[in-house]
Amino acid sequence: ALTAQINPHFLYNSLSIINWMAIKSRQKEISRVTLALSTFYRTALSKGADMVTVENCIRNIEAYLEIQLIMHDNDFKVEWSVDSSVQQELVPKLALQPIVENALEHGLDVKEEGEKILRLSFFEEAGDVVIRVEDNGMGMEQAEKLLTYQAKGYGLKNVNDRMCILYGEDYAIRILSKVGQGTRVDMRIPKEVKKDET
């Protein structure tokens, strides 16, 4: 795996030097991106574990979105809803990032009018942890097809395949999309599953 090939100490030391240089030259935006990138990789690599806590997953996505907000000149808003009862539950590492990236690239980036909103929710429902990503972007027709074939620029099939292998077909990703209104993606993880401690 790629994460096994990365020397994290070199990466973190390099980012620390870049951050120090940015602070020294009063480049706040560069410092902000560098810190977010450092947090993103720290939480993504997660000491080689395949499973991470919801809390760690959130830190990873917060760092990712910090970078995206800078890249997008803060042209979208992020709303969070996190049920504290699920924060220590385990979820597959890096499963959420492709879904969030999809919402930005294929939902909000193509929305031409009105406020752009990305909503992330983490809650318990029927004994499962539910992670929901919603955007008020353009929406799409036949969104469920994204789960069955490898479309260019869409990482949903890989995430869906991984969820089905880990938890079975009942835990396939669910997509609800309406053209012109936006898209909602739900990922369910059974609460009782504890694979790797983080």
Go through the PLM ranges and name each one.
Residues 196-198:
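Short, charged, solvent-exposed linker or helix-capping segments at domain edges/interfaces
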Residues 1-176, 182-188, 194:
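Two-component histidine phosphotransfer core
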